[in-house]
Regions:
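Metal-cofactor-binding active-site regions of metalloenzymes
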Residues: 1-20, 37-40
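Histidine/acidic residue-rich metal-binding segments in metalloenzymes
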Residues: 20-35, 41-178
């Protein structure tokens, strides 16, 4: 749009296969780079450690990540498929896309950002455990690692799957109340 009542921009989506495109980005044309560290949307997964390190070390743009550990999710999913087949109850979603999957992935992303000096923003923090990875001892203007939480992760718990079912099934999953 030539005019807008809102300030908007788009992120460039990263994959295991588009590193060269990411490295060519003009930072004036995008808000940052969005990476899915756990499979969630189409082929937007970035789980190749070499690709991740190259992205983190090669750009000054904001790197925004959806943090879920793919190996943990796959192992949890296999366990639930063994028990339920292809008809896994929705109230098991938080056990597949678990607290540990989120914590492991967020930990790795933060470690990589600290190692490379990258600007990192973690989307959709969904566990209290993940919040322990962040500090409020740094003035906001000096922070290079930030995060956000979605309201639904604050409002709903795993107990709500029984009454709301797929209406509250998203990634990262709604978790157990702390």
């Amino acid at each position: 749009a030539k005019t807008s009542h809102a300030n908007y921009s788009f992120m460039m989506g990263g994959t295991n296969d588009n590193l060269e495109e990411i490295l060519k980005i003009n930072p004036k044309n995008v808000a940052g780079i969005k990476l899915f560290l756990g499979s969630s949307t189409g082929n937007m997964l970035v789980d190749n450690p070499e690709t991740l390190e190259k992205i983190f070390s090669s750009t000054k743009m904001l790197i925004a990540v959806h943090c879920e550990d793919e190996a943990t999710i796959k192992a949890n999913l296999e366990k639930h498929i063994e028990e339920y087949g292809d008809d896994i109850p929705v109230n098991k979603h938080h056990l597949i896309r678990s607290e540990e999957a989120c914590y492991l992935s967020s930990s790795k992303a933060i470690e990589l950002a600290q190692k490379t000096g990258a600007r990192l923003h973690i989307f959709h923090v969904s566990t209290a455990k993940e919040t322990e990875l962040f500090t409020n001892k740094i003035p906001l203007e000096n922070k290079k690692i930030t995060a956000e939480v979605c309201v639904h992760h604050l409002w709903f718990t795993d107990k709500d799957y029984d009454t709301r079912g797929n209406l509250i099934k998203w990634n990262p999953a709604v978790k157990t109340q702390t």
